[in-house]
């Protein structure tokens, strides 16, 4: 029986862990991020991966910092055949990677070498890509740079956001991993080097990247709102005087002479706004600061009452 240590944290990784367990591999331990405080009462919540581990009675390690920790030495002492990682959230020290009997492998959420880093799904949507996927790689010291062992594509639909892509990708990642594991264990896997000339990075989203600007076309505003949904959300700093998140919009075919940020058309159930380069979009769902999410009808009947065609409602500065 192959002994595995699994390392992962979010919902994306949970079906992958469960698939490994259900397919007869012996999971010696699970390593995940520490429980996080959630909500106004700051109640500690276990990661989705920890919940799976507890369900199956598997030992859990949650080091604040893995490198140099007592937990890392305990993991090494388990002498696993494989380490499998999926969105764990910390770098793996070389000492740990090199301690395994067969290999340390990673399930990465992109078509490598495109989008190395912590936010591959967000960047694929934000850049308007029509596909993404998963890649199984050997783990090396350099981030997401190991040889590729398997890869599978996933279509990005016009309605997809980061949440829906992660849901689909977790199942795809599970299936591709389970198909590839026997080849890795037997030594019959073909390892393909990544083309360093085609590397694109996708670092974690910074707070300033959540801001929507008036130099974006309607389709780019759509890409960004979907990339940052369900969290943290994309926002204009000054939308009718308030910081306002746009949760859902629809880019339209029509064009306008208005500069970006003006009301192109408004009635009881629709608000069309001008964007860069004469493009236009319709707002479907939004959230002014201090308010709950609301559909556009609720907004126009409340906070947004009295808007008129030709009125400027968005500015780049607060």
Curated annotation (Swiss-Prot):
Disulfide bonds listed in the record: none
Keyword entries, A-Z: Protein biosynthesis, Transferase
Pfam families, per database record: Formyl_trans_C, Formyl_trans_N
Catalytic activity: L-methionyl-tRNA(fMet) + (6R)-10-formyltetrahydrofolate = N-formyl-L-methionyl-tRNA(fMet) + (6S)-5,6,7,8-tetrahydrofolate + H(+)
A GO CC term assigned to this protein in UniProt: cytosol
Residues that bind (6S)-5,6,7,8-tetrahydrofolate: 110-113
Xref: Gene3D superfamilies: Formyl transferase, C-terminal domain (3.10.25.10), Formyl transferase, N-terminal domain (3.40.50.170)
InterPro entries (UniProt xref): Fmt (IPR005794), Formyl_trans_C (IPR005793), Formyl_trans_C_sf (IPR037022), Formyl_transf_N (IPR002376), Formyl_transf_N_sf (IPR036477), Formyl_transferase-like_C_sf (IPR011034), GART_AS (IPR001555), Met-tRNA-FMT_C (IPR044135)
Chain's role: Attaches a formyl group to the free amino group of methionyl-tRNA(fMet). The formyl group appears to play a dual role in the initiator identity of N-formylmethionyl-tRNA by promoting its recognition by IF2 and preventing the misappropriation of this tRNA by the elongation apparatus.
HAMAP family: Formyl_trans
Name of the protein this chain belongs to: Methionyl-tRNA formyltransferase
Organism: Ligilactobacillus salivarius (strain UCC118) (Lactobacillus salivarius)
